[in-house]
């Protein structure tokens, strides 16, 4: 699966646009890590536990994005983006989205 943040892929022709696809995950924050993050924010520095959760969440959202595009018969995702939002102060939503497409390599 080719995944790009652009609307086109150099060296490829877009044969068919299959529509919008997305992968979503919502994660709750652990009370202990929230407390630790609160203390860390007072003194400064990276919130490693939260960073790890966000990396894992983005990876899961990407995996779900690819699964949906594959189910539609796509071999590429164009204009891929991430959106992150907080829900109720306790959950983090991560959404990966883009346009599923069938592409083919141009003759050189």
From Swiss-Prot:
SUPFAM superfamilies xref list: YbjQ-like
Domain of life: Bacteria
Signal sequence, renumbered to the chain: none
Segments forming a coiled coil: none
InterPro entries xref list: UPF0145_dom_sf, UPF0145_YbjQ-like
Pfam families given in the database record: YbjQ_1
Family: Belongs to the UPF0145 family.
Name used for this protein in its record: UPF0145 protein Acel_2109
């Amino acid at each position: 699966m080719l995944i790009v943040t652009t609307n086109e892929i150099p060296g490829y022709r877009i044969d068919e646009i299959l529509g919008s696809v997305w992968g979503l995950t919502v994660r709750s924050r652990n009370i202990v890590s929230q407390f630790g993050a609160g203390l860390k924010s007072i003194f400064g520095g990276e919130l490693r536990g939260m960073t790890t959760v966000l990396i894992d969440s983005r990876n899961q959202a990407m995996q779900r994005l690819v699964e949906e595009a594959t189910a539609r018969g796509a071999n590429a995702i164009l204009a891929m983006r991430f959106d992150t939002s907080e829900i109720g102060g306790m959950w983090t939503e991560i959404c990966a989205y883009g346009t599923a497409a069938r592409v083919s390599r141009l003759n050189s």
